[in-house]
């Protein structure tokens, strides 16, 4: 059923090899193991109301998002949560490399 959580997936959402402008509205990604969202070779996208939540047990080392080789990405109203059971502090929310013109 769409919308039901699938625990222990390494990545919750992948967008790759897209140059055509696109939009995402009000997406919530929660409780994945490695990365909530992964963007690779993406350009000209706008993302509105993106929410991330990391669970204590499933994702103590999980990153909210990773972007590589992306350009012209705009993110508006991004929320990053960790549940109270996530006892480890988090230094990095988004890992970004080889990208241009990424705005939050």
Task: Annotate each language-model stretch with its function.
Residues 1-104:
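Extracellular/periplasmic carbohydrate-active domains that bind, remodel
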């Amino acid at each position: 059923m769409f919308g039901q959580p699938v625990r222990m997936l390494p990545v919750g959402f992948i967008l790759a090899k897209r140059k055509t402008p696109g939009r995402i509205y009000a997406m919530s990604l929660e409780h994945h193991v490695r990365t909530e969202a992964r963007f690779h070779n993406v350009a000209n996208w706008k993302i509105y109301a993106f929410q991330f939540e990391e669970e204590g047990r499933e994702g103590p080392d999980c990153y909210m998002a990773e972007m590589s080789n992306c350009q012209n990405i705009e993110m508006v109203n991004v929320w990053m949560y960790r549940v109270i059971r996530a006892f480890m502090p988090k230094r990095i929310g988004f890992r970004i490399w080889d990208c241009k013109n990424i705005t939050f």
